[in-house]
């Protein structure tokens, strides 16, 4: 009885070690041809974000459109939208400065097109607009904070 338990334990350990291997995630298709870039890129200012509108290339291998920018701290942000739509929402602008935004078309083999560079600037971020209306009042055992979130954004 004790030897059966040992054999079952050893078999379980053998299965656990045999199952541990590195899986490499890579695209199913593999070509080296990049898609054509997106065209006619325009944007609309929104509170703390911009909404890009573009014309998709007529590549049947197209998978998504990506846009990336680097903030003032040097952190790079990338946003993606499916090829089923021609708009892309880029969020996270903490101020109203001008940023350089690169827009790419990406195919099923993860080949990026040549970048389309545009200069964008967003409206006042929702957090900053809410901070300007912040009121602090004394209350029993503490304070009461109130503010107006006119853009109804997630703060």
Segments predicted by a language model, with ranges:
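Bacterial Sec-dependent N-terminal signal peptides
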Residues: 2-3, 12-42
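A charged, solvent-exposed segment within the mature domains of Sec-exported extracytoplasmic proteins
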Residues: 120-155
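Short beta-strand segments of immunoglobulin-like
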Residues: 39-45, 132-137
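Short beta-strand segments within Ig-like beta-sandwich modules, predominantly Fibronectin type-III
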Residues: 77-84
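Beta-strand-rich modules
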Residues: 63, 88-118, 155
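Conserved aromatic anchor
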Residues: 43, 47-60, 141-154
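Extracellular fibronectin type III
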Residues: 21-33, 107-130
């Amino acid at each position: 009885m004790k030897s059966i338990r040992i054999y079952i334990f050893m078999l379980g350990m053998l299965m656990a070690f045999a199952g541990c291997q590195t899986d490499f995630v890579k695209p199913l298709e593999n070509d080296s041809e990049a898609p054509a870039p997106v065209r006619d890129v325009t944007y609309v200012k929104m509170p703390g974000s911009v909404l890009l509108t573009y014309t998709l290339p007529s590549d049947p291998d197209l998978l998504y459109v990506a846009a990336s920018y680097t903030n003032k701290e040097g952190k790079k942000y990338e946003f993606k939208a499916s090829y089923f739509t021609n708009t892309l929402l880029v969020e996270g602008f903490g101020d109203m400065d001008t940023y350089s935004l690169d827009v790419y078309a990406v195919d099923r083999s993860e080949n990026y097109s040549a970048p389309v560079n545009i200069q964008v600037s967003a409206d006042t971020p929702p957090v900053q607009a809410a901070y300007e209306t912040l009121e602090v009042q004394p209350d029993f055992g503490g304070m009461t904070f109130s503010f107006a979130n006119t853009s109804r954004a997630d703060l």
